[in-house]
Every structure is written in C-alpha cells, then in structure tokens.
C-alpha cells in the first residue's frame, strides 16, 4: 500500500508566503496533492479559490480558534465556560470544510489553566458528543490529538490513555484519534507498540523527526524507514500530514521523500 503525504501549511512554505491561499499554490507547485490547513480566518474565499484552482485535496482542517485569548488560541473544545464559542467555531469550520470538500476536522482541545481537571473532561466529552452529531450530518470525521508539554505547555489533551478514555465515553465512531508521531515519541516513546495498542482508535497520522521536529530523514530518535513500513503494514490508507519544521527551507528539505523511497 502506497503512503500518501499532505503538506501541513501551518509549518511548510511559511518562509515564502504568509497567506494560506498562496501556500496552497506553492504546495501544489512543488508536488503535493493534499494539504492540511488551519481554519483560514479572514481569507476563506481566497482559500476556496486556491483549492479549486489547484485541485489539491484538503485532508484536514483545524477547528477555528480565538487568536486574541491566550487560553483559547489552541482551541476551545475542553475549556469550561466556552461552550457557546465552541459551537460557533464548530459550525464555521464545518461550513468551510464543506466548501473545500474536506472530510476531517481537528477538534483542538485548548489549554488547562487551573481549576478542576474533571470540569475540563466533562466539557470536552460533552462538546465532542455535540461535534459527533454535527459532523455526522455532514459525513465528516473529527479527530483529537495528544500533544506533548514541550510543544504546547498546558495543553489539556496530553496522553494517549486520556484520549482513549475520552473516546470511550464519547462512543462515536466518527470521533477518532490523531496520532502525531512527533508528539507520541515525546509522550510515551515505543512508537510501534503504542500504535499497535491504539490502532483501532486512529483516524489520522502526522509526522516529524524527534526531538527538533525537522524532516523525517534528519538524524533523530525515529527511524522513519522502519516507521513508514510499519504504517504500510498498519493498513492506513489516508493522508499523512507532514507537520514538521523545515531544517532549512521547505523545498530544500523535500528530498526526504525520494530518499526514503516514496513519492508525493
């Protein structure tokens, strides 16, 4: 089974373009057939035009977020008192995802800023159940991602066991786990064993080398030659998000694809 790679435009081509629309064009020009994007606040029409112009697949969209609030800039799904905001952000993101034919939304959790963790868990679970119903009506999937404390200190969703417990409580087949191997290695190590343990829950993958989050072929803790073969054996046939920080420039770093025996 051939692996398929999508350019994460929060990380790639940022040195050449500030707008998401222009990054989409650059990704297409450099061989990517799919992209992952944040909710494009203020440029939705331009992004829709760029997607139609290039024909790229939008494989993942991040939930809209509030840039003006330190706690909510990483999402609102788990944050008590933000339920109304979450629903409006969810509706806006689903509407945008429809326009670009994207079937998958990353339901970002937000930051834990004190109080009772049980309140965050209750809010998160309730909001994910709401999301499951809304996404199902649009034939979409929602994913949740455990993120390590070095990348985003205080992020609520910070372990695979916590994610598994939440998903069990939500009990919706269209709310799944996003396995970012960069975060997974930081959080738990033993990537292949952890993936096998949570295999049934995973609906999306992202990649980057550890510890510096560069390209997969850069020297680091993970052997991506082995990892990619494991993903093929895993049977995953969706897009794999390239959510890494280019060591030099995006284009100069794309040699990893052919070096590891793949194509875009």
From Swiss-Prot:
Cellular component, GO, one term: extracellular region
Pfam annotation, one family: AP_endonuc_2
Catalytic activity: 3-hydroxypyruvate = 2-hydroxy-3-oxopropanoate
BP term (GO), one: glyoxylate metabolic process
Enzyme class of the recorded protein, top EC level: isomerase
Alphabetical keyword list: Isomerase
Gene Ontology molecular function: any one: hydroxypyruvate isomerase activity
Active site per UniProt: 145 (proton donor/acceptor), 243 (proton donor/acceptor)
Gene3D superfamilies associated with the record: Divalent-metal-dependent TIM barrel enzymes
EC number per UniProt: 5.3.1.22
Function: Catalyzes the reversible isomerization between hydroxypyruvate and 2-hydroxy-3-oxopropanoate (also termed tartronate semialdehyde).
Protein name: Putative hydroxypyruvate isomerase
